[in-house]
Amino acid sequence: MNVIDHVRDMAAAGLHSNVRLLSSLLLTMSNNNPELFSPPQKYQLLVYHADSLFHDKEYRNAVSKYTMALQQKKALSKTSKVRPSTGNSASTPQSQCLPSEIEVKYKMAECYTMLKQDKDAIAILDGIPSRQRTPKINMMLANLYKKAGQERPSVTSYKEVLRQCPLALDAILGLLSLSVKGAEVASMTMNVIQTVPNLDWLSVWIKAYAFVHTGDNSRAISTICSLEKKSLLRDNVDLLGSLADLYFRAGDNKNSVLKFEQAQMLDPYLIKGMDVYGYLLAREGRLEDVENLGCRLFNISDQHAEPWVVSGCHSFYSKRYSRALYLGAKAIQLNSNSVQALLLKGAALRNMGRVQEAIIHFREAIRLAPCRLDCYEGLIECYLASNSIREAMVMANNVYKTLGANAQTLTLLATVCLEDPVTQEKAKTLLDKALTQRPDYIKAVVKKAELLSREQKYEDGIALLRNALANQSDCVLHRILGDFLVAVNEYQEAMDQYSIALSLDPNDQKSLEGMQKMEKEESPTDATQEEDVDDMEGSGEEGDLEGSDSEAAQWADQEQWFGMQ
């Protein structure tokens, strides 16, 4: 047993730090005396040393050593062709123990992906002949092609994975996301479904996620619910997470939160989807719950985007936009495909007046998730903020045609129509259609109430809001109802509605302002005193604003490493 055998055994045992130290010393010895180790032995040393560097996350250094190893292997191959084997018995086991050249190239590709050099990763894997590609190589290639927008080679690679491993479910999802028909994907798994027991659910699973990737949320929800109700798949965390995400996409935030909570109870260490859950909690004004969720996720892992997004949502809804921007950028650094991180950063940029930069982020979110309406909503809000009503109208019409005429797309189109006096009647028609489909859809109710307020039809608005609040409780709806009640001189009930709104979201400034305005009108003698107090407090508020400006500058200094500009 020679020293190379000892290095190999330590590598196999996972003693990476020991391998790194010993292989470094042995490589130096080899450089000083080239005759000390044979070419195959030096190749092995370089590979084992590179593997130890990879384990220590020194990816650039590892790539350098892997490259040297491949050069050594190339020279070794040329030598073996020129000089045939002499029959030396010692060389036979040595050649059998040589690390696979294909595995070395795969490790190099992994390094390149960690360094965000996807083109180099594709180039190194493309150099491997198709017949020699293992399933993991095809899977990595498929994901890299998909990320680069090269759909055809991505589909080919995913299909090759399924040919070798017909139960590779992530490869199935990859194909469905690239618009491959569910029936075609299912046909690739038919043999294994028929031969392996207890896999009768797989065809339904494929059907469900085919609906997901075509944006048919209602059929996707019903199909996954039918799966989840089966005794063998009941309480599956992945299915519950998918259901929660689908309810969110469909605008049913209440059921989305319930499913996320159910999944979280089953798996306290769940990270996937928690960014959306945190966003929903923040929207409801449950900032303390958001803060607790963020802390818990950071304790699980700070190397995922989700905890950073959750903390960013807490900052955003606390009106600390510069910090939300920083946290969103950090999340993008960790996962450039995080749609929620892109939306967070885009929203922060928009609220800071950097609309053109925000537009870039929302467009990237749309590219990654073309079936998610909230991505389009963010982009349209940017267009409206910059008075680009024509662009907003074109985008809203495209969404309406692409995702179909449902309550959400009708409301989005109506929102843009409300911005133009010429299209007010069209907005009214669209909102009526949306509310016919879903009378409880909050965004449609809010926009219809806004239209009724413009027309001063307060009684109609009150009836609309009471009907919407019959089966749900929402801060914004209670606040708007309070505003309408003030308009018809129902002050006591208006005060009650503002109080309910503030109990749901203590940070809702508009409800607080409505309540304070009523109190001033009821007590005119105290008004001047309150104004004096406000003036005295004003200096303190100015100090806070200055502090937030300095904080903005502090976070802005760090934009040099932000995920996307």
UniProtKB/Swiss-Prot annotation:
Compartments, record wording: Cytoplasm, Cytoskeleton; Nucleus; Cytoplasm, Cytoskeleton, Spindle
Assigned keywords, A-Z: Acetylation, Cell cycle, Cell division, Cytoplasm, Cytoskeleton, Intellectual disability, Mitosis, Nucleus, Repeat, TPR repeat, Ubl conjugation pathway
GO BP terms in the entry: anaphase-promoting complex-dependent catabolic process; brain development; cell division; positive regulation of mitotic metaphase/anaphase transition; protein branched polyubiquitination; protein K11-linked ubiquitination; protein K48-linked ubiquitination; protein ubiquitination
GO terms of molecular function: enzyme-substrate adaptor activity; protein phosphatase binding
Pathway: Protein modification; protein ubiquitination
Claim: Cell division is one of the keywords in the record: yes
Positions of TPR repeats: 101-134, 169-202, 203-236, 237-270, 339-372, 373-406, 407-441, 442-474, 475-508, 509-531
InterPro entries per record: TPR-like_helical_dom_sf (IPR011990), TPR_rpt (IPR019734)
Coiled-coil residue spans: none
Cellular component terms per the entry's GO annotation: anaphase-promoting complex; cytosol; heterochromatin; intercellular bridge; intracellular membrane-bounded organelle; microtubule cytoskeleton; mitotic spindle; nucleoplasm
Residues with PTM N6-acetyllysine: K229
Keyword Transferase: no
Biased composition (Basic and acidic residues): 513-523
Listed Acidic residues bias regions: 528-549
Pfam families according to UniProt: TPR_16 (PF13432), TPR_8 (PF13181)
Protein family (similarity comment): Belongs to the APC7 family.
Task of the protein: Component of the anaphase promoting complex/cyclosome (APC/C), a cell cycle-regulated E3 ubiquitin ligase that controls progression through mitosis and the G1 phase of the cell cycle. The APC/C complex acts by mediating ubiquitination and subsequent degradation of target proteins: it mainly mediates the formation of 'Lys-11'-linked polyubiquitin chains and, to a lower extent, the formation of 'Lys-48'- and 'Lys-63'-linked polyubiquitin chains. The APC/C complex catalyzes assembly of branched 'Lys-11'-/'Lys-48'-linked branched ubiquitin chains on target proteins.
Disease: Ferguson-Bonni neurodevelopmental syndrome: An autosomal recessive disorder characterized by global developmental delay, impaired intellectual development, and hypotonia with early motor delay. Additional features may include dysmorphic facies, mild skeletal abnormalities, and hearing loss.
Name the record gives this protein: Anaphase-promoting complex subunit 7
